[in-house]
């Protein structure tokens, strides 16, 4: 028994070491991953595991965040405009700061107009994801069929849905797609939206690492360094207490709006990456707390998939387009790649969740397989186009029996009762 326990412990330690190395190596290979939820979608060339013998895909359940956009609120652009204009007028800018001020001013009208809107890159991301889905699973789409697509009421989600569906229809005009952005379907994409007539409130909780956050030590001289690159001094400037917040948030948003280079050498990708682990802790706390709010999304996935499996629905795909504030918590609720592990050690959080997985246009695809010779329906999960693990018991990962998948997640949904049933 002792030998078995030791072997298991060694195996778990090896897995944790691999996960840590994997996350940090990915960050080193592409420092922009440290932009987290601002990271533009990255198309992968990862090879998918072949279908089990005799099995073919026949249905896909999907949830996606909208694509790349301008910053979600105009306060960033207005705050920077006020800050930089005053500093310019008072001769408090360095040469680097003046260069940035001029570039920002030239783009100001675009930024003031575009805040929160989908960008061209965001449109192209969903086109690419749709075509990749079609090419990866031609058996699902080759004969055409009915697809239901629903989105939140926010414009960038509606346009993301349109980009995806147009591309899918171009792949095969026999695919019939019904697009819907309506209060009738909010429970499937943004269930706690105030306009959702089925809105339910769920309990929230903090991740366990919060009790030990003080153990996390990471010096951050970057704010002072960045401020000194832009300003000779910050006396009497508006937004002075939030200068680094404004500058760093603009910097990480620039790849999404086609303005990389606007800030010159004020910040670098590597400098943002040096603070990633602390940023990742904040994001994990943000997506962990409201995980139960996404129970209606998971219930909708289970219900629609079960209807297809039973022959009560003729859908070949159900598509959902929402926001990072739902996809991230849904990732935790489902425990995708261990996101539900909830470690006590803050240094372990990076091994179960990386905030770049909740990037622009991030998406979950659940692909269903069936066989003429075997009655078991199988499910595979893709996170951003790559095969992912689930906490559902299986002996054939990355494939899971639908019956096990359904029972596991039904129990998980039912284990938490809404505060206002």
State what each model feature region is.
Residues 20-146, 152-318, 322-421:
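Signature for phosphate-centric chemistry
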